[in-house]
Amino acid sequence: IANPDMAQQQNEQVAQQSVSHPALASKRGMQALSDSGRGIPLLYSEIANKVNNAKDKPRKLKVLQDNDSVALRQVLRGAFDPKIEWAIPKGDVPYAVNEAPVGTDHTILSQEAKKLYMFVKGGDNTIKQSQRELIFIQMLEGLSAEEAEFLITVVNQKVNNKYKGFTANLVKEAFDWDDNFMKKEKKPSFPV
C-alpha cells in the first residue's frame, strides 16, 4: 500500500523490500521505533550485562523490575528453577554465530521465548531429539551473538557463573516469587 506522504521513488523501494519474519528487527524498524519516541526494549543479554555491572543489590533489582515482561520471566525461570529440565544437552552448542551487528537483521530472544517450551523435558514430546536440537541451533543462529550466548548460559543454568550477582534469589525477589518460582500469594489482611 502506497504511503501518500512518501515520494514515488520511496514507495517503490518499500514495495520492493522483501517481507521478513516478524521477529526480525531490521535497521529500518529499529530506526522507526527510535523516531517514534518509543523506547527500544533491551536485549536480554544487555539486561544481564546491566545486572552484572550494577554496583549493589537494589540497582540489580531495579534493572530486572524496569525490564519486567512475561518473556523475561519465562527465560529467567528456565535459568534458575531447578525443577525445569532442559532437553538440550548441556555444554557448548555447535552453531554458526550470527555476526550481524546488534540492531540489524536478527531475531530477538524476547520474541523467541514463546518457543522455549520445545526445549524443556515434557514441553513437546512429539518432536524427535535430533529435530529439537536442530531447531535450537537454528534459533541460536537467528539471534545476535550476545543473545545466543546468553540463551546458552540459560539452558546450561549457569547464568550466575557468567553474570556476577545474577542469582536465583535476586530474580525471586525482583519478581516477588516464592521458592517454586511462582508469584507469592497475597494473604488477606482481614480474617476470612
Where are these regions (language model features)?
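N-terminal nucleic-acid-engaging modules of covalent nucleotidyltransferase systems
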Residues: 1-192
